[in-house]
Amino acid sequence: MKCSLRVWFLSMAFLLVFIMSLLFTYSHHSMATLPYLDSGTLGGTHRVKLVPGYTGQQRLVKEGLSGKSCTCSRCMGDAGTSEWFDSHFDSNISPVWTRDNMNLTPDVQRWWMMLQPQFKSHNTNEVLEKLFQIVPGENPYRFRDPQQCRRCAVVGNSGNLRGSGYGQEVDSHNFIMRMNQAPTVGFEKDVGSRTTHHFMYPESAKNLPANVSFVLVPFKALDLMWIASALSTGQIRFTYAPVKSFLRVDKEKVQIYNPAFFKYIHDRWTEHHGRYPSTGMLVLFFALHVCDEVNVYGFGADSRGNWHHYWENNRYAGEFRKTGVHDADFEAHIIDILAKASKIEVYRGN
């Protein structure tokens, strides 16, 4: 009797081990074949599949995108198309200065404060705290939807836009980024009529329509104090030059260019050629970090080799290139490499 009972227990034990082995094999096979899951609980209606990632992680990839980061024909977020680009590009650094990245590292702080040194020093964080009570301190580009194609036009101010006929094409983009003076009235056929982002300094600032984001490019703490003043009390009227005491822009659409991002371009992309990157480069790399597809208009000389603005008739207006502040030739070289890497499309104009 005792022997029979012992045999029965051993048989049951072997059976249990066999069943557990089958379950483990089935489970392992199921994961290896990457089953599809309903992503309704993830806020969408698309089916997704589990993709092996790092230990303890599972990444969700939407079916049908073949791993692409957007639905454009070319996507900025797709790695592997250019080793040079991938080694320079850092998606973790935000082009917008916000409450979350308010604290600058000492090396960035020193570099930024030397761009336009001031006699009186200011506590940058205290200035930002006050500013973010007036304008948003959030990053509007935090989330990227791989099911969208955000097309962006970066419109420079080159005279090569005159007679180009690019206007309608420029206006077809989701984001249209312009800089400094950049008039559109009277030039719509060549430069377009729409603007979504306008990048300016205090010394170049102008009033904007309510549907346009004013992106302030600050060179000093006084620039931050100026925008807070220009949207409230109007006390600041002078930086190193006269500035508008009041500015008519949509407060909810004001964004502040991140000095850390500014230095990142200087260090990694323009590689310290010139004292600091030009406004055109600042806007171009802003677009490269918030857009899926980037098309560039109005950069470089015209077909006769003249460097002037499209609203000017003075072909000698490009004398700024000789100041040494920016290295226009090296920046043009970087733009050419980006185009060859299929990261941007450059429209050369007239």
UniProtKB/Swiss-Prot annotation:
Glycans are attached at residue 211. It catalyses: a beta-D-galactosyl-(1->3)-N-acetyl-alpha-D-galactosaminyl derivative + CMP-N-acetyl-beta-neuraminate = an N-acetyl-alpha-neuraminyl-(2->3)-beta-D-galactosyl-(1->3)-N-acetyl-alpha-D-galactosaminyl derivative + CMP + H(+); a ganglioside GM1 (d18:1(4E)) + CMP-N-acetyl-beta-neuraminate = a ganglioside GD1a (d18:1(4E)) + CMP + H(+); ganglioside GM1 (d18:1(4E)/18:0) + CMP-N-acetyl-beta-neuraminate = ganglioside GD1a (18:1(4E)/18:0) + CMP + H(+); a ganglioside GA1 + CMP-N-acetyl-beta-neuraminate = a ganglioside GM1b + CMP + H(+). The keyword NADP does not apply. Residues 1-6 are cytoplasmic. The keyword Protease does not apply. Substrate binds at residues 116, 157, 180, 240, 276, 280, 300, 309, 326. Residues 28-350 are lumenal. Pfam families: Glyco_transf_29. GO terms for biological process: ganglioside biosynthetic process via lactosylceramide; globoside biosynthetic process via lactosylceramide; glycolipid biosynthetic process; glycoprotein biosynthetic process; lipid glycosylation; oligosaccharide biosynthetic process; protein glycosylation; sialylation. InterPro entries: Beta-gal_alpha2-3_sialyltrans, Glyco_trans_29, GT29-like_sf, Sialyl_trans. The soluble form derives from the membrane form by proteolytic processing. Its main location: Golgi. Homodimer; disulfide-linked. Homodimer formation occurs in the endoplasmic reticulum. A beta-galactoside alpha2-3 sialyltransferase primarily involved in terminal sialylation of ganglio and globo series glycolipids. Catalyzes the transfer of sialic acid (N-acetyl-neuraminic acid; Neu5Ac) from the nucleotide sugar donor CMP-Neu5Ac onto acceptor Galbeta-(1->3)-GalNAc-terminated glycoconjugates through an alpha2-3 linkage. Sialylates GM1/GM1a, GA1/asialo-GM1 gangliosides to form GD1a and GM1b, respectively. This is CMP-N-acetylneuraminate-beta-galactosamide-alpha-2,3-sialyltransferase 2. It comes from Rattus norvegicus. The gene is St3gal2.
